[in-house]
Amino acid sequence: MVLELILALPLLGGAAVAGWRDHAARWLAVATNGATLALGVWVAVRVVRNGPLTGAEGVLRADALSAFMVVVIGAISLLASWLGVRTMALEVAGGRCSPRRATAYGVLVQAFVAAMLLAVLAANVGVLWVAVEATTVVTVFLVGHRRTRGALEASWKYLVICSVGIALAFFGTVLVYLCALRAGGHSASALDWTSLVAGARHLDPSVLRLGFALVVLGYGTKVGLVPLHSWLPDAHSQAPAPVSALMSGVLLTVAFYAILRFKAVTDAALGPGFSRTLLVVVALSSLAVAASLLLTQRDYKRMLAYHSIEHMGLVALGAAAGIPLAIAAVLLHILGHGLAKSVLFLTSGEIMAAEGTSRIDGVHALLARRPTLGGVFGTGLVALLGLPPFSLFSSELLMARAEFQVGLGWAAVAALAAMVVIFVAVVGHARHMLLGAPGPTEVLAPPPAWVAAPLVAGLVACGLIGVFAWPLSGLLHAAAHVVAP
C-alpha cells in the first residue's frame, strides 16, 4: 500500500492546485512532495532491512535501487516546488503569466513528479517505458510554459528529439522482450525485471546486444548523452527555473536508471565487456562535447545545462566500470549532482528575475550587489565542480578508483582532461558574474528568508553527504548489488 501512496501523493497535490486555484493549494503541493521524500526514506530503510516491497498486484516493486531513486526524486521535487511558489507568484504579478496558466503549471509539475516516481517503481520494463514517455509529454508543455518564440522552439525541439529517443528505447525493449520469450519465458512475466535477470543466461546474445545498444541510445537521449543531446541546453534555458531544476536534477538520472536496469540484464547474459565498451564511448564523447561547448558559452542557464552533459558523461563512465564500488559511486554522484544542480538552476531563476537577463556578460559583481544569491550561486558552482567538502568530490574519486581497478584508467585520465577544460571555462564565467565592484546604488535587498532557506539547505545537504556519507552506505551498497550482484 505504501508504494501506491507514494504515487498518489503528487497526484493529490496536483488535484489540490487544480481544484482550489489558491496560493495555499500550491503550498499543499509542496507538502505532498515533502511527504513523498519522507515515505521514500521510510521505504529505503525498510528495503535495506527486510528486502524489496511490492504493490499494485506486482505492477510496482521497490528494491534498494528504486528506493534510492524515490529519495532523490522526493528531495529535488521538494526544492523545486518550494521555489515554484515564488516563481509563479512573480510571473503572475509581473503580468507574464495568467492565473489560469499558473494553475496549469502547478498541475503539470505534480504530474511530472508522479511519472518519474512510476518509472523508478515499475516492476515491468513496459511500464517503465510508458512512464518515461509520460515525462516527455508533460515536460513539453512545461518547457513551453512562457509561450515565447524561444520557448516554443525549444519545446518542439525537445519533443521531436526525445520522441526519436523514446522510439529507439521502445524498439530495444521489444527486442529484449522477444529474447525473453524465445528463451522460454512466460508472456505475462517476460517484461519483469526479476524474471529478465534470473533468465539472462538463456537470452540470445546477438539480439540482446542490439537491444541494449538501442536502449542506451534511446534512453541516453533523455539523459542528455551524445549524440542526441542537442535538445538539452535549449529546453533547460527556456523552461521556468523550477522545471529546469527538476529536469536536470532528476529527470536525466531517471532515464539513466533505466539504462542501469537493462545493464544488469545485459551483463548477466553477456558479461560486462559489451556494455562497458558502449558506455565508455558514449561517456567520453559526451565529456568532450560538454568541454568544447562550455568554453564559448554566453548564457548562464545554458552553461548549467552543458554542465549536466558533463556529469551524465561521468555517471556513464562510472557505470561502465560496472563493479559494486563504481555503481555505489554513481548513485552518490546522482544524489550530489541533483542537489547542487537544482540549487543552481533555482538560484539562476532568482538572478534572472532580479537582473532581467540570462547572459553572462549582463551580470556582474553578484557577491557585492546581491550577496545571498551570489554566495549561493558561487558555492553551488564549487560543489558542481567537484571540490571538497561536497559529495561530488567523493563520488568522482570513488568512480576513478573503480575505473582504474577494472582497467579503465586511460578513460579516467581522458575524463580528467575534459574536466580540467570545463573547470577553467566555468571558473572564467563565474568570475565575470560574481566579482567586481558595485556602483553606489547597486547593493540590493536579499531575497526573502523563505526563498534563501531551501537553497542553502540543498547545499548544506550536499556538503554533509560528502563528509558524512555513512547513513547512506547501507542503501548505496544494497542498490549497487542490484546492478552488479
Residue ranges: model-predicted function:
Residues 1-5, 9-107, 187, 194, ...:
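Transmembrane helix-loop-helix hairpins at membrane boundaries of multipass inner-membrane proteins
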